[in-house]
Amino acid sequence: MGRFIFVSFGLLVVFLSLSGTAADCPSDWSSYEGHCYKPFDEPKTWADAEKFCTQQHKGSHLASFHSSEEADFVVTLTTPSLKTDLVWIGLKNIWNGCYWKWSDGTKLDYKDWREQFECLVSRTVNNEWLSMDCGTTCSFVCKFQA
C-alpha cells in the first residue's frame, strides 16, 4: 500500500510540473518560451488584425519577436497552416519614421527588415521582414504571455 501511495504521489508531481508549460495556452494555441501563438488565415489590414488579436485573449496582440529563434518558431507555425507566405507582425512605425514600436508595448530589441512603409510583415518562406502599406490585407499571428 505504501508503494502505491509513493508511486501515485510521484505521478501527481510529474503531472503538475508538466501542466505549467503548454497547458497555460488554450488548446488551439501553440506555446513557446512562456507565450502563446496562433496564426490566422483571415486577411486583414494591420489595424484590423491588431484589433482582432486583442479580442482573442486578454493581453493578446500581433506577434512581437525578440530573437531569431522566436521568429523561427513562428515560421514553423505559419508555414503549414497559411495559404500565404506574408503575415502581419506587431511592429509599426510611429511618428513618421522616428520611432518603431511593437503593438504589445515590448522593447524593440531584435529587428530584421528594410524600412519603407509604416507596418511590417514577415515572409514565412525565408523569415525575412518587409515593410508594407498598413492598408494591405494579410494573414497574421497573435501572441500573448501565458
UniProtKB/Swiss-Prot annotation:
Molecular function terms from GO: metal ion binding; toxin activity
Pfam families: Lectin_C (PF00059)
Chain residues that bind Ca(2+): S64, E70
Signal peptide: 1-23
PROSITE patterns: C_TYPE_LECTIN_1 (PS00615), C_TYPE_LECTIN_2 (PS50041)
Disulphides: C25-C36, C53-C142, C119-C134
Cellular localisation: Secreted
GO CC annotations on file: extracellular region
Domain C-type lectin: 24-146
Swiss-Prot/TrEMBL keywords: Blood coagulation cascade inhibiting toxin, Calcium, Disulfide bond, Hemostasis impairing toxin, Metal-binding, Platelet aggregation inhibiting toxin, Secreted, Signal, Toxin
SMART domains: CLECT
Tissue distribution of the protein: Expressed by the venom gland.
PANTHER family assigned to the protein according to its UniProt record, in alphabetical order: MANNOSE, PHOSPHOLIPASE, LECTIN RECEPTOR RELATED
Protein purpose: Anticoagulant protein which binds to the gamma-carboxyglutamic acid-domain regions of factor IX (F9) and factor X (F10) in the presence of calcium with a 1 to 1 stoichiometry. Also inhibits platelet aggregation by binding to platelet glycoprotein Ibalpha (GP1BA) and functioning as a blocker of von Willebrand factor (VWF). Is devoid of hemorrhagic and lethal activities. Possesses antithrombotic and thrombolytic activities. Also hydrolyzes the Aalpha-chain of fibrinogen (FGA). Does not affect the Bbeta-chain (FGB) and the gamma chain (FGG).
Subunit architecture: Heterodimer of subunits A and B; disulfide-linked.
Identification of the protein by name: Snaclec agkisacutacin subunit B
Top-level taxonomy: Eukaryota, Metazoa, Chordata, Craniata, Vertebrata
